[in-house]
């Protein structure tokens, strides 16, 4: 089995690929102050709960956009699975069958999204990843990353309000019944949730206009189900798209290794 790790700013998402399907997907809050032991115990517990031995893991692929978490999780992988993970980075990006945009700067999560979308949908599309940041990654049907747009994610926007204003606070991310908020909670929900609905539609519309093509929009990420009004707007909602890209990159790297 193949194990994938996607280290983001909010969560460490772990996917176990059982040759033809995602057998399990787990999420652990990403906290840099937690020791390696914390993550090691959590991951081992996941395997115990699913009645699996850690030795079923044949290879591990790791993506990280949090530098101070990378080595910590690498050490956990070495300790638990007795192997070195394949770490996504510029040297690997340059060997991929797709054309990676600015390989020495682009985030490995964006590359994974592009790879997953290219191989899954076989056409030019834009991936809207709802995470700590909301990212829009456009990839062509020929496997070329065409460009990226980045804005703060929903939770990040709420946190910014609560941290930078005296009287506003965190609120649940729910669709408001009305655009006319009647208290602090519904006012923030109206502004953020309805506002982000418009933001997503406008960014995708601008990309389509620039390309001169009505390309499909694909949603992924932990917050992709929050703005339910966008459900019909997306061609597909694929919560495991980043992991799928990681898997494909891992399999491609393994084939390259066999040839050398």
Which positions does each model-derived feature cover?
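Glycine-rich phosphate-binding loop plus the immediately following alpha-helix
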Residues: 31-37, 106-108, 113-115, 119-122, ...
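Glycine-rich phosphate-binding loop signature in dinucleotide/nucleotide-binding domains
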Residues: 52-55, 120-122, 210-213
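Long hydrophobic alpha-helical segments typical of transmembrane helices together
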Residues: 210-260
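Short beta-strand-loop/turn "lid" adjacent to the catalytic site in phosphate-handling enzymes
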Residues: 52-106, 142-147, 153-154, 182-193, ...
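N-terminal glycine/serine-rich phosphate-binding loop of ATP-dependent small-molecule kinases
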Residues: 1-92
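Active-site nucleophile and cofactor-binding loops and adjacent substrate-binding regions
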Residues: 103-110, 237-241
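A short, acidic, amphipathic alpha-helical segment used as a generic capping/interface helix at domain edges
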Residues: 196-210
């Amino acid at each position: 089995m193949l194990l994938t790790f996607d280290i983001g700013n909010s969560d460490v998402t772990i996917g176990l690929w059982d040759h033809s399907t995602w057998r399990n997907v787990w999420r652990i809050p990403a906290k840099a102050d937690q020791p390696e032991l914390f993550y090691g115990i959590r991951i081992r517990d996941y395997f115990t709960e699913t009645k699996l031995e850690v030795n079923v893991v044949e290879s591990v692929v790791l993506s990280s956009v949090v530098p101070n978490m990378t080595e910590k999780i690498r050490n956990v992988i070495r300790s638990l699975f007795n192997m070195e993970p394949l770490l996504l980075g510029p040297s690997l990006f340059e060997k991929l069958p797709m054309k990676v945009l600015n390989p020495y700067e682009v985030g490995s999560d964006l590359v994974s999204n592009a790879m997953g979308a290219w191989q899954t949908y076989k056409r030019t599309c834009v991936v809207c990843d709802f995470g700590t940041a909301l990212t829009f990654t456009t990839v062509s049907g020929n496997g070329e990353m065409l460009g990226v747009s980045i804005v703060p994610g929903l939770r990040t926007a709420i946190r910014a309000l609560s941290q930078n204003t005296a009287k506003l606070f965190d609120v649940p991310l729910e669709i408001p019944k009305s655009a006319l908020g009647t208290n602090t909670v519904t006012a923030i929900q109206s502004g953020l949730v309805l506002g982000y609905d418009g933001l997503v539609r406008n960014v995708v519309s601008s990309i389509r206009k620039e390309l001169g093509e009505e390309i499909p929009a694909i949603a992924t990420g932990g917050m992709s189900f929050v703005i339910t009004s966008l459900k019909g707007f997306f061609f597909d909602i694929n919560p495991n798209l980043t992991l799928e890209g990681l898997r494909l990159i891992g399999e491609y790297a393994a084939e390259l290794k066999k040839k050398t």
